[in-house]
Amino acid sequence: MSQQKMRIHNQYVKDLSLENPNSPFLSLKEVPNIDVMVNVNSVKLEGSEGTEGESEEKSFHEITLHIEAKAMIKDENIKDGVAFICETKYCGIFSVENFAELSTEEVNRALFIGGPTFLFPFAREVIARVTSSGGFPPLMLDPIDFEAMYEQQSRQQKSNASNENFN
């Protein structure tokens, strides 16, 4: 088995929004309840890098870390209870070397664990900055265990596939 190597070529904010629907009437006398949703997506890109004669095979992927944070408060003056909704899609362009020699599991682990683990601190900083600019204390997201998230989704997909076989 060859050495797996993953490189990042670029990282960027693909989408960013902050909804502050009740701002003129909102007073944060209590700590809001924060609900965070995280999703990871990977899309294989066409193209190559390198010089002629380079025999090393690389596979390029755009990995998107989608984070949505919704802050809810209990305030009789605010009908829907929404303090803010902050959403970002933070992306990176990664290459995986020796792609053809890797198993599907090795590639998936690199893309869905390694990629978002690298991107998360940058996405967290963007969210903290944007929520602060919206007039709220900076939202500092807790670290995410992307390996546990990947394992849980893998088990769920296997369970769904086995259930489909019985129907």
Swiss-Prot record:
It is found in: Cytoplasm. It holds the Pfam family SecB. Keywords: Chaperone, Cytoplasm, Protein transport, Translocation, Transport. InterPro entries: SecB (IPR003708), SecB-like_sf (IPR035958). The keyword Kinase does not apply. One of its GO terms (cellular component) is cytoplasm. One of its GO terms (biological process) is protein folding. It comes from the Bacteria. Homotetramer, a dimer of dimers. One homotetramer interacts with 1 SecA dimer. Belongs to the SecB family. One of the proteins required for the normal export of preproteins out of the cell cytoplasm. It is a molecular chaperone that binds to a subset of precursor proteins, maintaining them in a translocation-competent state. It also specifically binds to its receptor SecA. This is Protein-export protein SecB. It comes from Wolbachia sp. subsp. Brugia malayi (strain TRS).
